[in-house]
Curated annotation (Swiss-Prot):
It comes from Homo sapiens (Human). Has antibacterial activity. Belongs to the beta-defensin family. GO terms for biological process: antimicrobial humoral immune response mediated by antimicrobial peptide; defense response to bacterium; defense response to Gram-negative bacterium; innate immune response. This is Beta-defensin 127.
């Protein structure tokens, strides 16, 4: 009976913080706190418990591919020949100086 009680107590104990597989990084890419990262993972930062935040390479690359749309180019202010002629006609002082 005593052995059963000891086993029951050990089974119901919560693991410590370092034994838990904690999630880390941000909302877009989830990583796991580990001492050594797996082959398909990259250590990106340190977790609170001193372990590495291991991120999956495929998820990280997929997140980098999602980019913001490019900014619209500003309108160019190039004058056409007709615009230039209109400007000259509106300024009579320029006409008199050029003749």
């Amino acid at each position: 009976m005593g052995l059963f009680m000891i086993i029951a107590i050990l089974l119901f104990q919560k693991p410590t913080v370092t034994e838990q597989l904690k999630k880390c990084w941000n909302n877009y890419v989830q990583g796991h706190c580990r001492k050594i990262c797996r082959v398909n993972e990259v250590p990106e930062a340190l977790c609170e418990n001193g372990r590495y935040c291991c991120l999956n390479i495929k998820e990280l690359e997929a997140c980098k591919k999602i980019t913001k749309p490019p900014r619209p180019k500003p309108a160019t202010l190039a004058l056409t020949l007709q615009d230039y002629v209109t400007i000259i006609e509106n300024f009579p002082s320029l006409k008199t100086q050029s003749t």
